[in-house]
Swiss-Prot record:
Listed EC numbers: 6.3.5.3, 3.5.1.2
Keyword NAD among UniProt keywords: no
Organism (species): Acaryochloris marina (strain MBIC 11017)
Keyword Nucleotide-binding (UniProt): yes
Key words of the record: ATP-binding, Cytoplasm, Glutamine amidotransferase, Hydrolase, Ligase, Nucleotide-binding, Purine biosynthesis
Protein role: Part of the phosphoribosylformylglycinamidine synthase complex involved in the purines biosynthetic pathway. Catalyzes the ATP-dependent conversion of formylglycinamide ribonucleotide (FGAR) and glutamine to yield formylglycinamidine ribonucleotide (FGAM) and glutamate. The FGAM synthase complex is composed of three subunits. PurQ produces an ammonia molecule by converting glutamine to glutamate. PurL transfers the ammonia molecule to FGAR to form FGAM in an ATP-dependent manner.
Database matches in SUPFAM superfamilies: Class I glutamine amidotransferase-like
Signal peptide: none
Domain Glutamine amidotransferase type-1: 3-234
Reactions that this protein is recorded to catalyse: N(2)-formyl-N(1)-(5-phospho-beta-D-ribosyl)glycinamide + L-glutamine + ATP + H2O = 2-formamido-N(1)-(5-O-phospho-beta-D-ribosyl)acetamidine + L-glutamate + ADP + phosphate + H(+); L-glutamine + H2O = L-glutamate + NH4(+)
Gene Ontology CC terms, in alphabetical order: cytoplasm
Protein name in the entry: Phosphoribosylformylglycinamidine synthase subunit PurQ
Amino acid sequence: MKFGVLVFPGSNCDRDVVLVTRDLLKQPTRMVWHQETDISDLDVVVIPGGFSYGDYLRCGAISRFSPAMQATMAHAEQGKLVLGICNGFQVLTESGLLPGALVRNRDLHFICDRVPVRVERTNLPWTQAYQAGQVITLPIAHGEGCYYADPETLKQLQANQQILFRYCQPNGEITPDSNPNGSVENIAGICNRQGNVVGMMPHPERASDPTLGYTDGLLLFQGVLNSLMAQGVTA
């Protein structure tokens, strides 16, 4: 299988993702410049964190119009896999591939921390390596990571089991105190109805290298790899 990592002016987590997919998982990976239009060779597209286009106008608002994102939208419409991390999550909501929006953190401060996150759904390629209700620890680093959705959209997210990750206490309890940024319902990550497009504010790629001492994020990438290999997708 082959991964592609989008690179916008201002991206700064693209190489972190490549380290995981190419160096840890040993999968072919190429970096996709924002002006590229042909990504037909890719099985999985990752939109990394950073400050695409300087976060001008709104986080992700300009990126959505890039040629590479237009190709990514077509990729997603074909049922292929797309992951947006942090700024990538913002790009996915701006492009309409995921519902809702990411707004300023509740306390209006940039947050950089490691937080417990509860896995809500495990029957998708992205989450199949986890256990339902499992609490994992992932880094966060964002200033506009507060997920918002209107009541009707939130109702649909819940009904369709589109909420994949929630901020929680170390014991898995969902509380206001465990919510670092004010996200509605403690939401840390969601998917589209089909389950092939995922957006999350925490950084799994920063919790993947054993050298760093914890690898909770690696299971997300390993789950995708196992799923596609089971379908017969090879390098």
